[in-house]
């Protein structure tokens, strides 16, 4: 069954973040879990207890875009040699001792928590896998709407839309339009949209949200 519209709202939901037992928030004391599905895979606590320092640093750098990734990785590994990191606030405390934050309102543990969560749940791989499936789901002129909350998610969406909406130059002797050849399945609509100041005032978590919209090209 074709869909007229597919909406992706990537990342954590507020109920997940505000549920202390899930272990996503550094502001709420809880067991260090971070799994979207806590019946599958390693918890953040289990992963942090065994991961090599070099791999941990790479995860924090690539998925958290943390400037002090080496410093944080070393602090975590050094701490765990004394005892396992059991809770969210315990991990946040370890990170806070080695990270200097210049951005107003940003907690020192923000980027590292994001990185570990993305790694534990394979979030970016999930996005890369699901986006191509939309091409078969959408009806002609159907809309793909994506809302991403950080640059890593948005980068994947942006690249996917660009790759599937590239204009193709046809030789002059080809007496057909691009739309008739079944090329470029998507058309990007408008520019990326960010939350207004009014919306951010009502929902501060929307401050980093970016929405992109594309339409499936109807074939003749």
Name the predicted role of every residue range.
Residues 3-220:
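S-adenosyl-L-methionine-dependent methyltransferase catalytic core, i.e., the SAM/SAH-binding region
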């Amino acid at each position: 069954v074709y869909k007229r519209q597919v909406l992706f709202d990537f990342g954590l939901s507020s109920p997940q973040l505000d549920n202390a037992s899930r272990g996503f928030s550094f502001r709420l004391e809880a067991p260090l879990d971070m799994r979207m599905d806590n019946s599958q895979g390693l918890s953040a606590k289990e992963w942090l207890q065994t991961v090599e320092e070099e791999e941990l640093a790479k995860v924090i750098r690539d998925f958290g875009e943390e400037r002090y990734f080496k410093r944080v990785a070393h602090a975590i590994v050094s701490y765990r040699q004394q005892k396992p990191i059991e809770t969210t606030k315990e991990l946040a405390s370890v990170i806070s001792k080695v990270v200097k934050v210049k951005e107003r309102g940003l907690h020192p543990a923000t980027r590292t928590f994001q990185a570990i969560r993305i790694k534990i749940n394979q979030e970016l791989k999930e996005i890369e896998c699901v986006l191509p499936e939309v091409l078969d789901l959408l009806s002609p002129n159907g809309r793909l709407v994506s809302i991403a909350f950080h640059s890593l998610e948005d980068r994947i969406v942006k690249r996917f839309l660009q790759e599937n909406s590239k204009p193709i130059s046809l030789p002059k002797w080809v007496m057909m339009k691009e739309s008739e050849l079944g090329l470029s399945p998507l058309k990007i609509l408008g520019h990326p949209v960010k939350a207004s100041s009014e919306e951010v005032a009502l929902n501060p978590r929307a401050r980093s949200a970016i929405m992109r919209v594309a339409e499936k090209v109807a074939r003749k």
